[in-house]
Amino acid sequence: MAISNTNLLQTKKPISLPLLAFITLFLMLLNRVNSSDSLSFTFDNFRPDQRDLILQGDAKISSGGDSLQLTKTDTSGKPVRGSVGRALYYTPLHLWDSSTNRLASFQTTFTFVLSSPTNNPGDGIAFFIAPPETTIPPGSSGGLLGLFSPDNALNNSLNQIVAVEFDTFVNNNWDPSHRHIGIDVNTIKSSATVRWQRENGSLATAQISYNSDTKKLSVVSSYPNTQANEDYTVSYDVDLKTELPEWVRVGFSGSTGGYVQNHNILSWTFNSNLQSSRAKKEDIYIKRYV
């Protein structure tokens, strides 16, 4: 018995408008996930054969492969004077989009240990953001933390670098009168600081976040395994789009001068998100369905 095509067509139910809207919304959300420019990585520890880090100066992966050692030690493991080392993640970060003027948000968390054989440690570490081609400035050991040359350390018009420093030695020319965590914007003189009590040889944690909507750079640090039980917090309002180029690299720097300590990073995670112009347009359509 023959069945007419007309009857077959009549038995098919049309797709309902709510279902069509749901499918459209789902496809937009799926597309939006792929419309952001993000950088994400995690180091639970560091391997001697690490290939996704750029090591500069005296920085190296410890022989045991458990930490990133920023400054030099002698054969007995004691820190030496006048050492500078930096480590940067190999893949550049798209910090802002010149075609849309949109700016990325990011968050990074790391653990570190600073240890010294004396009660006068120097000089500290910094998490920093700089142009992709950045290298160690000449003469930047000691209080300059491997970030600035002596000639332009206090001239913010000659630098492109934003850093969060964990400073253990007071340099009277630019530091407050105590050990501190500071936010540096194109100069070694911090724009915002908080007094910081360094715990020799203890594990420290730090979380640094940037909100692209509020333009606020925030820092929280603590020593979770000590009796201190104190969070050190500092923040600063800064438009990174006006201070840094569109593409940058992120990393760590450490230095010793006349006084010394070991500077070791034990773990590091980083996550950023830069929404594209396509995702912004899709947000408008998504709101119509929600």
UniProtKB/Swiss-Prot annotation:
Binding site for Ca(2+): 167, 171, 175
SUPFAM superfamilies associated with the record: Concanavalin A-like lectins/glucanases
Transmembrane segments: none
Residues binding Mn(2+): 165, 167, 175, 180
Annotated signal peptide: 1-35
GO molecular function, one term: metal ion binding
Biological role stated in the UniProt entry: Mannose/glucose binding bark lectin.
Protein name, as recorded: Agglutinin-2
Organism per entry: Cladrastis kentukea
